[in-house]
Swiss-Prot record:
Domain BTB: 12-81
Molecular-function GO terms, alphabetical: ankyrin binding; cullin family protein binding; identical protein binding
Subcellular location per the Swiss-Prot or TrEMBL entry: Cytoplasm, Myofibril, Sarcomere, M line
Protein name according to UniProt: BTB/POZ domain-containing protein KCTD6
SUPFAM superfamilies listed in its UniProt record: POZ domain
Gene3D superfamilies per UniProt: Potassium Channel Kv1.1, Chain A (3.30.710.10)
Superkingdom assignment: Eukaryota
Predominant location category: cytoplasm
Tissue specificity remark: Highly expressed in cerebellum and brain.
Species of the source: Mus musculus
Region named Interaction with CUL3: 10-110
One GO CC term, this protein: M band
Length: 237
C-alpha cells in the first residue's frame, strides 16, 4: 500500500460503539497518541472487536467517551461547568492510557475559571402527620425554599401565584408555602412543580436528607431536605 492509500484510510470515517453509544471519527484522531490503547488498537497492535453492525466495539462508559474523543481531536480538556464525574473520567483516561489526558485530570490547577462560584438552593418539606388518621392525611405542611439567588425567589413568587391560598410567605432569602389541614397530594404536586422550576434554572440535586421526629403522642413529624447547586460567574460589584 503506498502513502497515498494510507493517507486516505487514515482520514476515512470510523464508527465506534462505546458502551452502546455510537461515535464517528477518523483513524488519524484515534491514533493521535500511538502509545495509547486506542493508538495500539487502531494501529494494528491490539485485537479489536465489532458489534453486529460491524462497528468497532469498546465495552466502556459511552457518555464519557465524548470527552476522551474531544481531547484526541484538540489536545485540550473541555468540560461543562457543572461536570461532577472526575473520578469516572480519570478511570476512562487510565483505561485508554492517554498520558496527556491523565496529566490534565491530575493537574492541581482548577479545571474551572477562577471567576466562578457555586449557588445553592435548599428545599425543605416539613409534614406533621396524624398517627390515628389515614396515612396520607396531613395536619400541616410547610414547604420552604432558601437561597441567596433573589431572581429565583422572585420567579417562584411570581410563577406560583395560584398557591397563594396556601399562605405563601416571602422573606429575605426564603419563600415558604404553608398548607393545613390538607391532603398529602397537594403538597406533592407543589413540590414536584418547584423541583422542575428549580432544575430548569440550571440547578442539579446535590443531596437529599430525611429526618423523622415525634413531637406529640398523636403526631409524627417528617422532614425532607433537598440541596440544589449550580455554578455561576462572579460579577464585579
Amino acid at each position: 500500500m503506498d502513502n497515498g492509500d494510507w493517507g486516505y484510510m487514515m482520514s476515512d470515517p470510523v464508527t465506534l460503539n462505546v458502551g452502546g453509544h455510537l461515535y464517528t471519527t477518523s483513524l488519524t484522531t484515534l491514533t493521535r497518541y500511538p502509545d495509547s490503547m486506542l493508538g495500539a488498537m487502531f494501529g494494528g497492535d491490539f485485537p479489536t472487536a465489532r458489534d453486529p453492525q460491524g462497528n468497532y466495539f469498546i465495552d466502556r462508559d459511552g457518555p464519557l467517551f465524548r470527552y476522551v474523543l474531544n481531547f484526541l481531536r484538540t489536545s485540550e480538556l473541555t468540560l461543562p461547568l457543572d461536570f461532577k464525574e472526575f473520578d469516572l473520567l480519570r478511570k476512562e483516561a487510565d483505561f485508554y492510557q492517554i498520558e496527556p489526558l491523565i496529566q490534565c485530570l491530575n493537574d492541581p490547577r482548577p479545571l474551572y475559571p477562577m471567576d466562578t462560584f457555586e449557588e445553592v438552593v435548599e428545599l425543605s418539606s416539613t409534614r406533621k402527620l396524624s398517627k390515628y388518621s389515614n396515612p396520607v392525611a396531613v395536619i400541616i405542611t410547610q414547604l420552604t425554599i432558601t437561597t441567596k439567588v433573589h431572581s429565583l425567589l422572585e420567579g417562584i413568587s411570581n410563577y406560583f401565584t395560584k398557591w397563594n391560598k396556601h399562605m405563601m410567605d416571602t422573606r429575605d432569602c426564603q419563600v415558604s408555602f404553608t398548607f393545613g389541614p390538607c391532603d398529602y397530594h397537594q403538597e406533592v404536586s407543589l413540590r414536584v412543580h418547584l423541583m422542575e422550576y428549580i432544575t430548569k434554572q440550571g440547578f442539579t440535586i446535590r443531596n437529599t436528607r430525611v429526618h423523622h421526629m415525634s413531637e406529640r403522642a398523636n403526631e409524627n413529624t417528617v422532614e425532607h431536605n433537598w440541596t440544589f447547586c449550580r455554578l455561576a460567574r462572579k460579577t464585579d460589584d
